[in-house]
Structures are given as structure tokens and as C-alpha cells.
């Protein structure tokens, strides 16, 4: 079994930089397996697993799928209390969760090695919509919490399985501590061999179907949602805000697993961010079209999506709807506000003069809807890091409104129900300092026998309440249909 880098190369890397860990790796052929099969093997041996995948706008599969299991640590935070849990210990701290996350990342700082994918280990999980109360402590968010998810749930994975979809290879990655390097390297050789044996010969977890025991019930019926829109428009007329995003939640009783729903989503709604999580906070599946923020080698990107139409039944119908969407002054105005907000958010942590709009108002097509999309870029300041990027941008303007803080206050008042994972950030912070997170939309999450789906619509001065209610329904369609189809039965 060939392992790179060698022990001698690791010694040189450790001597050249102040690294806490170094990733070593080996490869297997993957032409007779799939990411879903690997996931089921991992679910057999660990209750904490993830799968991150990607598909481009033209439905080509992204190069890498990332899988992980058996985390070293789990960091959770709820209402200011942070718990750090390992296999043997658990402690709760009232200190700043961001400081705790930074300490963990500093202890595990890693070099970026040539030939390895963008993610080789780090923290994987979510920051909820309500995480803004930690980055903006003067903001009061006191809505009811009926779902019971954490404000932050991040798991530290030192083992990563990267599925190279182009080369049809599995890259098995293990991060080793740089203290006692020789001992740790030889221990890691044995662990990589164990990972190899698990993937080649491991049993798959039992297939557990998904079953909805009740129909979905909305948090707000059409009349209640339209009334909420009218109240929001009053705030707009009074000058409090220019725009606000109001969401609606669907809830049903469920038994079984969401894995089959994810299998449906990844084939019927391929998206830039597709994810499956299973952990102490339940299951999360989704196919999000929208980046919250990406940081790679010092360059920041965010991709505002705002302005929506349903997909047409034919290519000609699509083209007509695209033209209609781009000509709609209400949609263009909403999009421009959110591009400006994205520039402002990126600008908080970027070097002066580096913020620019790279792509402006292009049409992005997805399975059930189309959006207007733009790309905002900046170069991060030397004194800022990945967590600063999350602080600056979460929640995205496309899920809150403008001005952002006042919009969040109005959402708290009108919805009066904690959003939890919806509208937050899902993804990873790498040991190398890189970050890739999507906005937590087009997702379902389950806990304690219930499954939740949320969607929202952007409200501006001339919004038609009934139309905004229908937009919410359209945005939830792909996830609802995936859950319905998963019930029809899938081969194990």
C-alpha cells in the first residue's frame, strides 16, 4: 500500500511550518462502488457520518464527493452554552463558541499538499440561522423554538474519504499529529489499512425506508402568510427596511431514515451543494443551489441568488420564463439589493479595493425553479479567517433582507418561530484554513419522529402576497417530492 507523503517527507513538512497535523493518504480504485454504497458502509460502524457532493449547472457531477465517519470531537452550542464531546469526555463551557472553534482549528492546522483535494479534514456540520446572535450580540432573537436544533453543530473529522469522480479513485486521508511524528505515522499506516479493509469488505448498514405518517402541515396557512406579508410591507413603507425574506415551515410525522430521500434528491435535483448528515441532532438532507461563502487560498466568493420563476415544460417555455424574469423590475430590484448586500458583507473582511462583481444577473436553472444569479469576489484580509467570513455573511441577505439586522428583527417578530438550520450554513472549515458553505435551503431535517421542510420568499414594496405564498410552495416542491418518492420504495 503506497502512502504519501512518506515519513521522511512528513518530517521535512513539520520542520518547515507550525502545523498541528499533516494529512497522509492512499488510493483505491472506485470503479465498482458509489458514494452511496460507501456511506452505507460507514453508517454501519458510526452514528456520526456525512456525505458532501456537488453537481455543476449543466448537471455534470463535481469532481469530488467527501465522506467522513467516527469524528474525534463534536462541538455543539445552544443559547450560549458550548459542549465539546469526544468518545471519552464531555464538557460544557459558557465561553465564546467562536474562540473554542478557533482553538480547535489552530491545534489542527494543516499544510495544503499538492495532489490532494480541497478538503482533507476539518470541521463539518452547520451554523444555524440564529448563529447571528453570536456575531451580533446586540440582536435579540427570542422566537419560540419548536424544532430543538443546535445553534452550532460541528464535528471534527481527522479521517476523510474523497471520492474522485473523474479518476474513479477513492482517496483515503488520515491526519496525523506532528508531535511524536514517527510513532503517529506508523499508527496511521495501520489505520489507513483498516480503512481500506472496511471499504473493501465492510458490511452495509441495514436499509431503513422513509415513511411519512401524516401529511405536511404548514406553520402558516395562505391567509396567515399573506397577512404576514402585509405587515412586512408596512415596515417597508415606513422605511425600516427595503426587503425582508419571510419563510414558512412544513412539518410531518415520520419514521425511518432520510437517506432514501437524499438518494432521490441527488438524482432529480442535482445541485452545487448536496449533503447528507446523520448525528446527535438528527438527520439532514438537501440540495442547495446557493453558496453562503467560499474561502479558498485567500479568495472569498459569495453567489447571491434572487428572483425566481418555475421551470417551463419545454425549452421554449424556459426561454420565455427567463426573459420574463430578467425583465421583471421587482425581481431585478430585489436582486440588486442583495448583490449590494453581498458586496457589503464581503467587504467587511476583504482587503480594500478587492471586492468586485465577477458575474452579474445570469440565469441559473434547477429542477423545479430558475433564479437570477450573480458572483461577488474579494481577497480576505491577513488578520481575518474562515470564521470571520461566516460571521460577516451569515445569514445571507437572500435569507434575511436589507438592511440585514433590522430585517432579522422583523423576521423574529413576524414568524415568531426559530428557524434553526434553515437559512443557516452547511459545509466545512478545513484544517488548511479554507471554507466552503452553502445556504441551508432546499433541505429536510428530521428529529424525534418529525421531519421539517422550510422555504421563503423575498418581500419588497410591490410584492403580491398570494404570489409570494406560491413561491414558497414552489421552492419546497423538490424536497417534498423527494420525500414522497422515497416512500414508494427503493431497492436497498
Label each residue range with its predicted role.
Residues 1-492:
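Extended alpha-helical targeting/anchoring segments
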Amino acid at each position: 500500500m503506497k502512502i504519501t507523503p512518506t515519513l521522511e517527507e512528513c518530517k521535512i513538512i513539520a520542520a518547515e511550518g507550525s502545523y498541528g497535523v499533516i494529512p497522509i493518504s492512499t488510493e483505491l480504485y472506485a470503479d465498482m462502488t458509489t458514494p452511496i454504497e460507501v456511506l452505507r458502509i460507514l453508517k454501519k460502524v458510526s452514528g456520526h457520518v456525512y456525505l458532501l457532493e456537488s453537481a455543476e449547472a449543466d448537471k455534470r457531477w463535481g469532481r469530488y464527493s467527501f465522506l467522513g465517519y467516527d469524528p474525534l470531537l463534536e462541538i455543539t452550542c445552544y443559547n450560549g452554552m458550548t459542549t465539546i464531546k469526544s468518545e471519552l469526555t464531555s464538557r460544557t463551557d459558557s465561553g465564546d463558541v467562536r474562540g473554542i472553534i478557533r482553538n480547535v482549528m489552530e491545534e489542527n492546522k494543516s499544510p495544503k499538499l499538492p495532489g490532494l483535494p480541497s478538503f482533507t479534514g476539518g470541521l463539518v456540520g452547520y451554523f444555524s440561522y440564529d448563529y447571528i446572535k453570536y456575531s451580533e450580540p446586540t440582536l435579540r432573537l427570542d422566537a419560540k423554538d419548536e424544532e430543538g436544533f443546535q445553534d452550532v453543530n460541528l464535528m471534527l473529522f481527522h479521517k476523510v474519504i474523497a471520492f474522485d469522480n473523474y479518476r474513479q479513485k477513492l482517496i483515503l486521508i488520515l491526519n496525523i499529529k506532528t508531535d511524536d511524528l514517527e510513532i503517529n505515522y506508523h499508527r496511521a499506516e495501520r489505520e489507513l489499512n483498516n480503512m481500506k479493509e472496511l471499504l473493501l469488505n465492510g458490511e452495509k448498514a441495514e436499509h431503513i425506508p422513509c415513511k411519512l405518517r401524516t401529511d405536511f402541515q404548514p406553520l402558516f396557512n395562505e391567509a396567515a402568510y399573506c397577512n404576514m406579508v402585509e405587515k412586512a410591507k408596512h415596515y417597508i413603507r415606513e422605511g425600516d427596511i427595503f426587503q425582508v425574506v419571510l419563510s414558512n415551515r412544513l412539518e410531518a410525522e415520520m419514521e425511518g431514515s432520510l437517506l432514501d430521500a437524499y438518494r432521490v434528491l441527488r438524482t432529480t435535483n442535482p445541485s452545487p451543494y448536496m449533503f447528507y448528515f446523520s448525528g446527535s441532532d438528527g438527520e439532514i438532507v438537501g440540495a442547495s443551489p446557493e453558496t453562503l461563502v467560499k474561502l479558498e487560498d485567500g479568495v472569498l466568493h459569495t453567489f447571491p441568488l434572487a428572483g425566481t420563476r418555475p421551470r417551463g415544460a419545454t425549452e421554449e417555455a424556459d426561454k420565455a420564463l427567463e426573459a420574463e424574469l430578467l425583465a421583471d423590475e421587482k425581481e431585478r430590484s430585489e436582486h440588486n439589493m442583495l448583490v449590494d448586500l453581498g458586496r457589503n458583507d464581503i467587504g467587511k473582511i476583504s482587503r480594500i479595493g478587492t471586492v468586485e462583481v465577477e458575474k452579474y444577473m445570469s440565469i441559473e436553472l434547477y429542477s423545479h425553479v430558475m433564479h437570477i444569479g450573480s458572483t461577488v469576489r474579494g481577497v480576505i484580509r491577513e488578520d481575518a479567517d474562515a470564521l470571520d467570513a461566516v460571521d460577516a455573511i451569515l445569514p445571507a441577505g437572500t435569507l434575511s433582507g436589507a438592511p440585514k439586522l433590522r430585517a432579522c428583527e422583523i423576521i423574529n417578530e413576524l414568524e415568531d418561530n426559530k428557524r434553526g438550520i434553515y437559512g443557516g450554513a452547511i459545509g466545512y472549515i478545513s484544517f488548511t484554513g479554507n471554507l466552503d458553505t452553502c445556504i441551508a435551503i432546499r433541505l429536510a431535517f428530521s428529529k424525534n419522529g418529525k421531519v421539517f421542510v422550510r422555504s421563503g420568499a423575498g418581500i419588497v414594496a410591490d410584492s403580491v402576497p398570494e404570489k409570494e405564498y406560491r413561491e414558497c410552495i414552489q421552492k419546497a416542491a423538490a424536497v417534498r417530492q423527494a420525500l414522497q418518492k422515497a416512500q414508494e420504495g427503493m431497492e436497498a
